[in-house]
Amino acid sequence: MDNNEVVTEEVAAVVENNTGIEIEPLFEEQVDFDTFSKSDFRVVKVKNCEAVPKSKKLLRFKLDDGTENERTILSGVHAFYEPEELVGKTLLAIVNLPPRSMMGIDSCGMLLSAIHNVNGEEKLNLVMLDDAIPAGAKLH
């Protein structure tokens, strides 16, 4: 498939280009602007990151979100990152989701990431931003 072709509903569940990279097709269902605008996307800085005990997947992030309070978000990215390599990184989070308890720890938000397959192997990349962007900056 040419990289410039548009993904349509006729495309199967996975799109593969000539590099062996597979991506999921675009959603067909549209979200109205009012619904989308309720999501609060903010820049966060990783102050600390550690593996969650008894979990193979979860990392616990302590984040600066530009407020006086430190934010905790858990994310199932341990298969793709070691905790120490994420300290100091600038990431993107949705911060107005209700807290969700995982492994007895409240996760207050969601870090955004991109998922794709390369030659059948799943890859994940956290959305990392320029370090010059301050914690708490709102994305529009």
What are these language model-derived features?
Residues 1-140:
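Phosphate-backbone binding interfaces of nucleic-acid-interacting proteins
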